[in-house]
Amino acid sequence: MAQQSQRPISNRHISLLNRNGLILLLLLALFVILGVFLPLTKSSLFMFPNTTSSSLSPSSSLSVSDWRDYSLAQAVKFVAKNETVIVCAVSYPFLPFLNNWLISISRQKHQEKVLVIAEDYATLYKVNEKWPGHAVLIPPALDPQSAHKFGSQGFFNLTSRRPQHLLNILELGYNVMYNDVDMVWLQDPFDYLQGSYDAYFMDDMIAIKPLNHSHDLPPLSRSGVTYVCSCMIFLRSTDGGKLLMKTWVEEIQAQPWNNTQAKKPHDQPAFNRALHKTANQVKVYLLPQSAFPSGGLYFRNETWVNETRGKHVIVHNNYIIGYDKKMKRFQDFSLWLVDDHALESPLGKLEIYQEQNTTTEGKNLTKIVRKQRKNRGKKHKLP
């Protein structure tokens, strides 16, 4: 009787072992599956939360053809933060200036919302190699060597595409800040975008204004022009912002390139005309000169710089022509950050000149950089 009563218990143990063993095997298999596939999917979702399985996910492993297919809509969705993006348009020779600008933006914690509009494929691949997803090319690609020469047709072709790029972003539903890359951020410009205006911009004048100057659109001068700079613009995705960009596009199209003109056309006069044509329909805000000075004021008027110490937000290296001259002036004023602070940029250290040594322009740029690094000249102290 005792033996018979123990058999069911023994059988029950065996049954439980078999069942538990099966469960353990299933759990082990599940852990193996999760261990292999979950990190891949999780890292993809963590790094690129704005992408979907049906869209192109930015990744350093993407092929050249993939980056060619990367669209503006995908790029803006990837980089946007709080429905806002910061954009610039860059050709390959100006990558060092892009890196310098990015370092200054990184110091203000806004680098992740930056989108580089590459004007040539070399720029597209280089930026996305270092910083996947943060560069997009909107065809057609431009000649990288002629696009950086101020006053050239290549430069005009580059800048004349700008309002259409900005309009496209606005129509996607995003606010956008545009910067030229020969700028340096010293403070956070978003702190100065007060109110609910459609467009914010900076003056390009060297004449000193009072600290409490008007923030309205400047009136036309006696010659019928104003000097608002198209180098730094913030636009909200409003009907007014879109209208301003559409009008700017129309004004540029009305002044096609003509090499015989005494003053070759560029985008800034067209922007000023667009501002005045839409003055009754677009709410605009002129940023304070003390915070957003032109290069003609900041680099040439030491007295004014000292009087406005601590107020400067973005410095524009304009009122000077030439790649090497711009770099030299940044170096003289301790605003060339690339040599000593490259690791603060999302792009890190860029080795780009060796790739251009097969061209005459590439060799010239290499000589410029070597010369500037060897002889920095006397440095001015920042106020």
From Swiss-Prot:
Q: Which residues are glycosylated?
A: N50, N82, N157, N212, N258, N301, N306, N357, N364
Tissue range of expression? Answer: Expressed around trichome support cells in the adaxial epidermis of rosette leaves, in cauline leaves, petals and both the proximal and distal ends of siliques.
Residue spans, topological domain Lumenal: 42-383
Identify the enzyme class. transferase
For whether the record's keyword set contains Protein biosynthesis, the answer is no
GO CC, alphabetical: Golgi membrane
The residues that cross the membrane are: 21-41
Specify the domain of life of the species encoding this protein.
Eukaryota
Q: Which SUPFAM superfamilies match?
A: Nucleotide-diphospho-sugar transferases (SSF53448)
| Molecular function terms, GO-annotated | UDP-xylosyltransferase activity
**Any idea where this protein resides?**
Golgi apparatus membrane
Residues in the Cytoplasmic compartment per record: 1-20
The record describes its membrane topology as: Single-pass type II membrane protein
Obligatory cofactor(s): Mn(2+); Mg(2+)
What are its E.C. numbers? 2.4.2.-
On modification after translation, the UniProt record reads: Glycosylated.
Position of motif DXD motif?
A: 180-182
> What's the entry's take on its domains?
The conserved DXD motif is involved in enzyme activity.
Q: PANTHER family in the record, alphabetically?
A: UDP-D-XYLOSE:L-FUCOSE ALPHA-1,3-D-XYLOSYLTRANSFERASE 3, UDP-D-XYLOSE:L-FUCOSE ALPHA-1,3-D-XYLOSYLTRANSFERASE-RELATED
Q: Which family does it belong to?
A: Belongs to the glycosyltransferase 77 family.
Q: Identify this protein by name.
A: UDP-D-xylose:L-fucose alpha-1,3-D-xylosyltransferase 3
Q: Which organism is it from?
A: Arabidopsis thaliana (Mouse-ear cress)
What is the primary gene name for this protein? RGXT3
